[in-house]
Amino acid sequence: MNLSAKTVVLIAIGAALYGIGGLPMFGIPVFANTTLKPAMAVLALFSVLFGPLVGFLVGFIGHWVTDMFAGWGVWLTWVLGSGLVGLIIGFYPKITRGRLEMGKFTKCDFALFVFLAFLGNVIGYGCSAYLDSVLYAEPFTKVVAQLIIIAAGNTLLIAIVGHYILTAVAKRKQQSYNLKEAD
């Protein structure tokens, strides 16, 4: 795997923003050891704009940073879950064939974005919940409750914040796209 300098910088910036933004002081505690993090919007944005590899690494490294600075130790199961969320949301530009880059963000594109956010949260944090239950003997009902709360909360947060950000990105790209066509 050969990453360009630009990609490495994007991953570092995204992971730092997601990692620091994921700290408990910026989140909303919702359940046992479970916090709704507004930083999920950062993960979704980097995933949509730069693809699955950047999304995975921003989620993985960023969650690792959160866990290290929060002081509760690194929970690799949840670090992996955040990486998977970023990976799945990162397929958005491939599925839409880069419509956002052309300044297009339709209702169908938004629905796909929300679906990928939900799917990413269910698969990513579903893996985390399963692995917590198997590896750490966490009560199954607890990890399933965490999964349901986080998947629903994160999807809602990503949908609301993401709608405004991606609409603005599309508008900006459309202006740039129109300038290129005028040349």
Swiss-Prot record:
It is a multi-pass membrane protein. One of its GO terms (cellular component) is plasma membrane. Its main location: membrane. Disulfide bonds: none annotated. The keyword Transmembrane helix applies. Keywords: Cell membrane, Membrane, Transmembrane, Transmembrane helix. The chain crosses the membrane at residues 8-28, 41-61, 69-89, 110-130, 147-167. It is found in: Cell membrane. PANTHER family: UPF0397 PROTEIN BC_2624-RELATED, UPF0397 PROTEIN SPR0429. Belongs to the UPF0397 family. This is UPF0397 protein PBPRA2239. It comes from Photobacterium profundum (strain SS9).
